[in-house]
A protein has these predicted regions:
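A solvent-exposed beta-alpha-beta segment
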Residues: 125-126, 133-140, 150-160
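Arginine/glycine-rich "motif VI" loop of SF2 helicases in the C-terminal RecA-like domain
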Residues: 20, 120, 145-154, 172
């Protein structure tokens, strides 16, 4: 294994808590910053020796509690006491940024009527509802979206990981509750960032399995 936790002969990394070997996308990389404080490297691009931890809140909390960062780096470091919450905020920001970028590119519509119209035209690739959206509006849009997706043999990804305030800030307009993105790279990034945030928050499902991926015909928030 190399100094960054890579298993010899492959791209797998070893979790500093469970010691399990997993692909990088199922882990979070941390590095020591210039001041000696541990820093989440969600994009996996920061220089320096990395410490890899399973991408769940539970694992990050355990890494802090067990001193896994100092042990892996073999040096004294400073670990923020709210590291697990910091990671969650950064993941939510990445999802909001993905929504913002897609919106600026003209690939997102917002508002119940516009989302409903895009679904009807078959142009919606992913729905984004605020976590605090009213259940009736969500249900109406979801039923139509899933029915059309089922008829076409396509997935119906639905994201509910951001609050209305977070969606409004990302899209630069007030009171955003419902949004939809057309297909392409922007929609794919939305789905992947939501999947990552959801897995971090929920960890393992009862029974030991991982949470199902966002890009199935289901609500990522259920």
């Amino acid at each position: 294994m190399d100094c960054d936790g890579e298993v010899d002969g492959g791209p797998l990394r070893q979790c500093a808590v469970s010691r399990a070997h997993k692909p990088p996308e199922e882990l979070i990389r941390f590095v020591a910053g210039p001041g000696g404080a541990i820093v989440p490297d969600l994009a996996r691009r920061l220089p320096g020796r990395g410490v890899w931890v399973d991408a769940t809140r539970e694992a990050v909390v355990a890494a802090v509690r067990k001193g896994a960062f100092a042990r892996s780096l073999k040096r004294q470091i400073s670990v923020p006491p709210d590291l697990a919450s910091m990671v969650e905020r950064l993941m939510a920001r990445r999802l909001a940024d993905a929504l913002s970028i897609a919106n600026k590119a003209g690939l997102v519509v917002a508002g119940f009527a516009k989302v409903d119209e895009l679904i009807t035209r078959g142009g919606a690739a992913v729905l984004v509802h605020a976590a605090d959206a009213a259940a009736d509006g969500v249900a109406k849009l979801d039923r139509k979206f899933k029915a059309l997706a089922d008829a076409g043999g396509k997935p119906a990804p639905i994201i509910r990981e951001l609050t209305g305030a977070e969606m409004s800030l990302a899209m630069g307009r007030p009171n955003v509750i419902h949004a939809a993105a057309v297909g392409g790279g922007a929609a794919h990034r939305l789905i992947e960032e939501a999947r990552r945030l959801r897995r971090y928050r929920l960890g393992q499902e009862p029974g030991g399995g991982a949470p199902p991926p966002v890009n199935q015909t289901q609500d990522v928030h259920d």
